[in-house]
Amino acid sequence: MPTDVTLKKVRLSVSNAVHSLAVLVARDEGLFRDQGLDVEVVRTPGSAHVDTDRQAVRDAIFERPLEALYNTGGVDQFRLCEWGVVKRAVDGELCGQRPAKIVALGAAMSKFAIVASPHSGIFEPEQLKDTPVAVTVYNGSHFTTLKMLEGFLRKDEIKVTNAGTMHQRLEALRRGELAAATFNEPWISVAQKQGFPIIMESHSTRSEAASEEMDGPTLAAMFRAEAEAAKMINANPGPYAHYITEEARGLLEPNELQTWRLLYAPPTPYTRERFERTYQWMLGYPELVTPGATYESVVDNRAWE
């Protein structure tokens, strides 16, 4: 095993635990160290945290805490939903942000669920026609909501809105101020525990982004560690539930988390076919992403070179 002197120092960003569980497990189980890495996890406010204010979910995505941290060099690598990373890689540099390339399809395949207010009378997706669904704009809950509802509604019938963090959304549902909202864990389990109806749910894959300062061998070592962590989580998720339920601050115990929703896989190269399919889908909605990007301009699978 490498000694402390030989370990390469890496700073990674983590916000919502369910999307970065493989990173947290790899750190705490010593898997990064086994790969010669000294990984520092930098926590940023996420929409799943009870004590997060609305700055983490503001509509101006490049002003959110994660973006500010990355732009100032606080971290060199982060993960978002696949569509969010495409948007960051394409639009970020156009907006004068620190450049970031897509470097992998990530480990987390997080579940998102559309949950209805008990007062709404909504029990099926078709009833969400022209009804605003609360999401984090331009993040996984937004894109996955569009994907899910496309099977039941026309694009022009799908409406989304920003109603704050997931805790704030749940309380707005409870008060009847919203008809529906989209959540990831632990908030899907919290909603189930409290009797809210779940309309539909789907997995949503993360993608990994990195600055040019992160070299291929370092990324490869990170991804090997995360692949091993994914195996451990899938084999026995219970011991790791606490990372996720901590964000709910007492509203959900680790044994109450619906761990069957957790799914992780080894990071893999981001293929041309995957990029083209994802990018073309995003271009089908106004203002989701800027046209004109190419696979060569936004993807760098340097970890596999």
Question: How would you label these PLM feature ranges?
Answer:
Residues 2-153, 179, 199:
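Short, glycine-/small- and polar/acidic-enriched structural segments
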Residues 42-43, 48-49, 85-87, 189-190, ...:
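Short secondary-structure capping/turn micro-motifs that flank functional sites
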Residues 283-305:
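Conserved C-terminal helix/tail region of periplasmic/extracytoplasmic solute-binding proteins
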Residues 22, 28, 66, 168-169, ...:
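Residues within well-ordered alpha-helices
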Residues 216-289:
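Secondary-structure end/capping motifs
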Residues 83, 160-161, 165-247:
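Pocket-lining segment of extracytoplasmic ligand-binding domains
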